[in-house]
Amino acid sequence: MTEFTTLLQQGNAWFFIPSAILLGALHGLEPGHSKTMMAAFIIAIKGTIKQAVMLGLAATISHTAVVWLIAFGGMVISKRFTAQSAEPWLQLISAVIIISTAFWMFWRTWRGERNWLENMHEHHHHDHEHHQDHDHDHDHDHDHEHHHHHEHGDNEEYQDAHARAHANDIKRRFDGREVTNWQILLFGLTGGLIPCPAAITVLLICIQLKALTLGATLVVSFSIGLALTLVTVGVGAAISVQQVAKRWSGFNTLAKRAPYFSSLLIGLVGVYMGVHGFMGIMR
């Protein structure tokens, strides 16, 4: 530790900044950073690359903020305060929000599918009454063309509602992009609540050595590396969804059921985090 603190006191930032970025990127590859959950979320909402970047950056911002809060809070409250004592509570809070998000995803998908089926039923009923006032030839032509167009339109409408977390009549009731972005930000901020003991330790050492600027720089660099990993995961998920949708005509049908599995996966992650956090609190 003496050699490390000496290097910090010498201010060799040119060496530590790239190293911190690399360590942050490698740290993002370790388990426990919600990468699977974030990818499942992006796939479930058929998110864009912009939304994937937003998700990764939100997770990084909350991750960095938690590091600072714990470091400074620990110094103020008690010298014996450690990151391990706060982690179970943060895990429990994250679990509650994550499980709520999973429930929302499941309910939103079910509601969108139900409203879509109701619209289909209402249209068929109206279409049947409309045919009774026309001759057979016109009825056949109208039914074929109009039904085909409606089936395509309804499927597209349902997919838009599914992707933007709305049931029906999106343009009249909501601005889907804004609502979806807020939901993505909330989910990303939640995913970054679990602190990194390594980053907290580095920051505490720098504070104790009265090298606050260097400590802040290292933590920011560490967070940049972490953001690169998380954003890459999200963008990869978004691109994969877009490419598969273009090359496979049956993707939209599969996408109607995929959110159920995604919400289940996210819910299981939330339950695991909650149990782990509860066990940590009870110790």
Curated annotation (Swiss-Prot):
Chain segments annotated as coiled-coil in the UniProt record: none
Entry-linked InterPro entries: Ni/Co_transpt_high_affinity (IPR011541), NiCoT_RcnA (IPR051224)
Side of membrane Periplasmic, spans: 1-12, 78-86, 206-218, 282-283
Pfam families (alphabetical): NicO
Regulation: induction: By nickel and cobalt. Transcriptionally repressed by RcnR.
Segments traversing the membrane: 13-33, 57-77, 87-107, 185-205, 219-239, 261-281
Comp. bias intervals (Basic and acidic residues): 129-144, 151-162
Keyword tRNA processing: no
Gene Ontology biological process: cobalt ion transport; response to cobalt ion; response to nickel cation
Ranges where the record places region Disordered: 127-162
GO molecular function, one term: monoatomic cation efflux transmembrane transporter activity
Compartments reported by the entry: Cell inner membrane
Membrane topology note: Multi-pass membrane protein
UniProt keyword terms in alphabetical order: Cell inner membrane, Cell membrane, Cobalt, Cobalt transport, Ion transport, Membrane, Nickel, Nickel transport, Transmembrane, Transmembrane helix, Transport
Entry's family note: Belongs to the NiCoT transporter (TC 2.A.52) family. RcnA subfamily.
Chain's role: Efflux system for nickel and cobalt.
Protein name per its UniProtKB record: Nickel/cobalt efflux system RcnA
Source organism (scientific name): Escherichia coli O157:H7
Phylogenetic lineage: Bacteria, Pseudomonadati, Pseudomonadota, Gammaproteobacteria, Enterobacterales
Gene: rcnA
